[in-house]
């Protein structure tokens, strides 16, 4: 796969003047795009993460602020870091960079599935990869509902709105997936350190989530879960997967960029 140079295929969701005083226009969801099915029918497995977590590849320390500050204070972040939404993409619109956790899922799945069956993409590009052939949309999320202690402390200090910035973008992502015209064809599997928030608040129906996975993606249980999803079988609401039993079973992503 040929990678675009840094100045190519970059999408800046800024407001044009870079002053950050108002929120940028939200990117349309899958159901809001003048939809045309992907020519290849879509990818079998689509991996993604909320925008505020997908930028983790750049080492932004503002991750902590986005996980805690209420959404109405997003303008402060926009003003201080007007380019935080810059996204680097490959020529096919897949994500050039993704958090290591997403790449680990990708590496784990490549033990069993073909490279052309899997893609990692940013939320705004889901409509380019989710189609009638798609059977799994897997989401990695850290703070989907904003129910962490830190979020409660900061939002109580700065105002009555208790929804942190990254929770806003997480909900936006889940709403987009839920509105997909192909939603009945695929399962939504959630992993990452924030999955417990969905389980403990029983937000499965609200967010359109089929299954929350706790544990390592390279587990044989995780691969079995994806097999069931691809066969369109019913999935458990929540599953604790077994840890690999030997050193060889533990995988690490080579990088946060996909392999060439």
Predicted regions and their residues:
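Short, charged N-terminal beta->alpha structural module
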Residues: 83-112
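Asparagine/serine/threonine-enriched low-complexity, disordered tracts
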Residues: 7-21
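Helix-enriched interaction subdomains in cytosolic or periplasmic regions
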Residues: 2-8, 28, 34, 38-42, ...
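Radical SAM [4Fe-4S] cluster-binding motif and immediate context
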Residues: 245-260
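Glycine-rich beta-alpha loop elements in corrinoid/cobalamin-binding modules
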Residues: 101-104, 117-249
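A short, charged/proline- and glycine-enriched loop
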Residues: 34-45, 132-133, 256-258
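Short N-terminal binding/cap micro-motifs at the start of the first secondary-structure element
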Residues: 52-61
């Amino acid at each position: 796969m040929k990678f675009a140079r840094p100045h190519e295929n970059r999408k800046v969701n800024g407001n044009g003047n870079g002053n950050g005083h108002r929120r940028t226009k939200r990117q349309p969801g899958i159901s809001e795009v003048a939809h045309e099915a992907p020519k290849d029918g879509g990818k079998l497995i689509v991996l993604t993460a909320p925008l505020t977590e997908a930028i983790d590849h750049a080492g932004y320390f503002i991750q902590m602020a986005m996980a805690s500050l209420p959404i109405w204070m997003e303008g402060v972040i926009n003003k201080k870091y007007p380019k935080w939404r810059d996204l680097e993409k490959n020529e096919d619109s897949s994500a050039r960079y993704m958090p290591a956790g997403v790449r680990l899922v990708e590496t784990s799945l490549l033990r069993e599935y073909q490279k052309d069956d899997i893609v990692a993409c940013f939320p705004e590009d889901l409509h380019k990869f989710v189609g009638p052939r798609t059977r799994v949309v897997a989401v990695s999320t850290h703070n989907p509902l904003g129910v962490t202690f830190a979020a409660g402390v900061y939002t109580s200090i700065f105002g009555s709105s208790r929804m942190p910035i990254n929770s806003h973008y997480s909900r936006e992502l889940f709403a987009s997936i839920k509105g997909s015209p192909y939603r009945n064809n695929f399962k939504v599997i959630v992993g990452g350190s924030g999955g417990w928030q969905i389980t403990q608040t029983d937000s499965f129906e609200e967010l359109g989530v089929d299954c929350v996975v706790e544990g390592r993606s390279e587990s044989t249980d995780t691969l079995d879960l994806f097999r069931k999803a691809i066969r369109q079988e019913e999935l458990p609401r929540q599953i604790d997967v077994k840890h690999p039993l030997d050193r060889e079973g533990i995988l690490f992503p080579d990088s946060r960029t996909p392999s060439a």
